[in-house]
Amino acid sequence: MKREMKAPTTPLESLQGDLKGKQGRTSGPARRSTKGQWTPEEDEVLCKAVERFQGKNWKKIAECFKDRTDVQCLHRWQKVLNPELVKGPWSKEEDNTIIDLVEKYGPKKWSTISQHLPGRIGKQCRERWHNHLNPGINKNAWTQEEELTLIRAHQIYGNKWAELMKFLPGRSDNSIKNHWNSSVKKKLDSYYASGLLDQCQSSPLIALQNKSIASSSSWMHSNGDEGSSRPGVDAEESECSQASTVFSQSTNDLQDEVQRGNEEYYMPEFHSGTEQQISNAASHAEPYYPSFKDVKIVVPEISCETECSKKFQNLNCSHELRTTTATEDQLPGVSNDAKQDRGLELLTHNMDNGGKNQALQQDFQSSVRLSDQPFLSNSDTDPEAQTLITDEECCRVLFPDNMKDSSTSSGEQGRNMVDPQNGKGSLCSQAAETHAHETGKVPALPWHPSSSEGLAGHNCVPLLDSDLKDSLLPRNDSNAPIQGCRLFGATELECKTDTNDGFIDTYGHVTSHGNDDNGGFPEQQGLSYIPKDSLKLVPLNSFSSPSRVNKIYFPIDDKPAEKDKGALCYEPPRFPSADIPFFSCDLVPSNSDLRQEYSPFGIRQLMISSMNCTTPLRLWDSPCHDRSPDVMLNDTAKSFSGAPSILKKRHRDLLSPVLDRRKDKKLKRAATSSLANDFSRLDVMLDEGDDCMTSRPSESPEDKNICASPSIARDNRNCASARLYQEMIPIDEEPKETLESGGVTSMQNENGCNDGGASAKNVSPSLSLHIIWYQL
C-alpha cells in the first residue's frame, strides 16, 4: 500500500516544481533544470570544480552536475560558497568607494566596481547604490498622498515593484516593497473606511518616470558604456536574482505612460537632483514652433484675361492670404508677439502713410516665398534663394525708358510702390527688417530712394501689366531720380540715354533711346506688342550675370512697324577670301549717315563698300571688271552662302601669305585665256598696221622686204608677243603650268625673233594696262 501511495505522488511533485519555476521566472532563457536547494554533496563538488578550473570556465564546471546550469553554479559560488565573500553591514569606506567609482564608471559597470571592493560582488554594490547611496532617493517619511498612490497603483499592477516605481518618484523598488509589506497593507481597511480612496479615484493616475533611481545627473554621460557589455561577461549578468533582474529591467527601460486628463497633474515634491532631471525631461515635451523659413505665403494667381475684364473695379475687397507650412495650414501656438517679430503683421495688413490699416487692394500674379530672403547676392544668405518676379518687371529694368516707369524711383514710393496717388499698393515683405532683427545688422539695399520714407528693406512684388497703364505714367518730380534702380544686387544695368535704340550689349549695360527734351521719356508706346501669355514667372537669378542678359528674348513679331523709328542694322560683312560672316555692331538706324562714326574693328571705311555691293571686293582685286565670265562666276558663287555647292570651291582659311600664292596662281591661269583673246585682237591690229604701212608714200627697202613677205612678218609678230608674255610670267613659275594654261608658249622662232621689237610698239593701250597690272 505504501508503494501504491508513493507512485502517484511523484508526478504531482514534479508538476508542482514546474509550476513553481514557471510562476517564479516569467522571462529570460529557458532553464534546463528546475531543481531546488543545493545539497551538501553538490556544494562539495562545486568547490572542487571551481578550484580545478580556477573559477573561469563555468560551463565546464556545470558539466560536473547533471541538472545544474552554469548560472546556478556561479550564483551558488559567489553568494554562498566563496570563502572571500564579505557579508554584513557596509562600512563608511566602502560606501565612499562605491560613490567615487559610480561617478567614474557610471551606474552600469558593477562588475568593474566590485573588483575594487574585496569580498563584494556586483549585485551587492548595485543594491547598495540604488537602495541607499543614490542621492536621488527620497529618504523622507511616506506621506498620505504617496500611500494612496501606492494603493491605487498596486490595484492595477500588483506586486510589480518596478512598475510601481514609475508612480512614486524618489522611491526605490526595495523601499516600496518594504513599505507595502510593513505598513500600507495593514492600513488598507482604514483607507477604505475613511473614503479617501473614493476621492482619489476621480483624479487620473499619472506615471512619472523615476529617473532619479536609475541614474543621477552626475554620471549620465557614462550611459553609453552599457552597449559595450555583453551577456555573460559582466558578473552582474549572472549573479542577479529574480527580483534584481526585474528591477534592473525596470530602471533601465523606463517609459512614459502619462494619461492626460482635465484635472491638474500630480506633481510631488522632489529633491534638487530629481527636479533637475525632470526639468530636462520636460524640456523635450515643449510644443514645436516652426521656424520662419518654413512659412510660405501663397497669393492666388489670376489670369490676365480676368484682370482685364474686371479692370480692377472691385479694389476695396480684401483677399485672403493662405499661410501654409510644410505639413500644416496654420501656425500652432504662435503668439502675436512672435508674429510681430517675424514680420507676419505686414503680410496681413498693408500700412499706408497715415498709419491706418487697409486691406490688400490688388490681386497678384506672383507668389512670395518668405524662405528666400531678397537680399544682396553677395550677402551671407542662401545662394540658392530666388525671388520670383514677372517678365513685365524684367522689362522695366531692362527697358526703363520704354516702360515709362518713373514711379519706381520717385520720392513717394515708400510702402506703396506703384502709383500711390490711386492707392494701389503692392505686397511688401519686411525681409530686411527681419534679417536686421535676427542678426542685429541692417543690410545695405541696392535701391536708394531719395525720400525719407524709402523702401527700408521692403521687397515689392510687381503688379500686373494691365495696372501698369495707369501706374507707369511719367510724373514730374524734382526729387525723383530717373535712373536710380538696380536689380537686387545683380550686375549693374546702367540706364543710359542715347540716340540709338534700346539694346543690350554683352557687358550688361542697357542702352535706351529717347528724347532728351522729355526728360528721357519717349513717346507713349509701352509693351503692347508683348503678348499677355508671355507674362510668366522667371527667377531673378537669370539676370544676375552679364552672360545671362543676352538670353532674354521677348516676342517682337507682333510689334507694328513704325516709320522713321529706326531699326537694328544687320548687314554682316565678310572677311576676304573666306565665307565667315561676323555680326554687325551697327547701333544706328539704317537710314542715317552715322555709320561712319562707329567702327568696332577699325575697318569701317574699308568694308563700307561691301555692304552695298552684291559681291564683296577683294583687297587685291583689280578695279576693272573686264575679267573672264568664269572667274566672275566663281567669285560670285563664293560670296553667296546660298549658292549651289557645285559652284563653290573648297573653303580656305583666313588671310595667309602662303595660301594667297595658290590663289594668285589660279588667277593667272584664268587670266591667260583672256590674254590669248587679247593677242588675237593684237593680230588684227597688227594686220591693220601693216596695211597702213603699205599705203605710206615713202617706204624703205627694208620695209618693202618685210611687207613683201607676209609670212615672215607674221612670225615676227608671234615672236614679239612671245617675248612680251615671257616678261609677264614670273620666274618661279614652271613652263609646264604655262603649257597647261592654254596660253602662248615661250618658244622662240628660228626666223629672227630679234626683229620683233618694232612690232611691240604697236600694242593697244588696253593690252598695255593688262601687262603693267600683271607685272605688278
Curated annotation (Swiss-Prot):
Pfam family, one: Myb_DNA-binding
Polar residues composition-biased segments: 240-253, 364-380, 423-432
Domain HTH myb-type: 30-81, 82-137, 138-188
A single MF term (Gene Ontology): sequence-specific DNA binding
CDD domains to which the protein is assigned, alphabetical: SANT
The entry's DNA-binding region: 58-81, 110-133, 161-184
GO terms classed as biological process: negative regulation of cell population proliferation; negative regulation of cellular response to caffeine; negative regulation of DNA-templated transcription; positive regulation of DNA-templated transcription; regulation of cytokinesis
Gene disruption phenotype: The double mutant myb3r1 myb3r4 often fails to complete cytokinesis, resulting in multinucleate cells with gapped walls and cell wall stubs in diverse tissues (e.g. in embryo during the first or second division after fertilization, in stomata guard mother cell) and several pleiotropic developmental defects, and associated with the selective reduction of several G2/M phase-specific genes transcript levels (e.g. CYCB2, CDC20.1 and KNOLLE). Hypersensitivity to caffeine, an inhibitor of cytokinesis.
SMART domains recorded: SANT
Extent of motif Nuclear localization signal: 648-655
Protein role: Transcription factor that binds 5'-AACGG-3' motifs in gene promoters. Transcription activator involved in the regulation of cytokinesis, probably via the activation of several G2/M phase-specific genes transcription (e.g. KNOLLE). Transcription repressor that regulates organ growth. Binds to the promoters of G2/M-specific genes and to E2F target genes to prevent their expression in post-mitotic cells and to restrict the time window of their expression in proliferating cells. Required for the maintenance of diploidy.
Protein name as catalogued: Transcription factor MYB3R-1
Species of provenance: Arabidopsis thaliana
